[in-house]
Amino acid sequence: MTQRQKESRRIAGLVQVALDTLRNQELAHYTDPVNAPQPYLSSIQLRDLVLQDEHSVSARRRLWARVESVVEGNANVRANLEEMEGGDETRVWRWVGSTGTPGMKELEFES
């Protein structure tokens, strides 16, 4: 497997983690709004969570640019600017698709 193929596979995995995290945040907000007061996550927070094991700044930048492109192109994700605590505006992503359990689609198609 070439380096490019390995990176593409890694990007796909990182995108899936990001989408699952956004879906879980949306669900957590409606299930327990005290512990999850916002239905969205800052793209920067999500980047730091998803790439916590990548310590090279240039690699993080390159990987995140590709992840960001895929996530923002997903019809289930809405990107907005939100004012955070302290008054700073930051880019946030919110899951707007179904929050059903991820494995349910597989079960429906098997029957």
Feature map (PLM): residue ranges:
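Intrinsically disordered, low-complexity juxtamembrane tails/stalks of eukaryotic membrane proteins
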Residues: Q3-S111
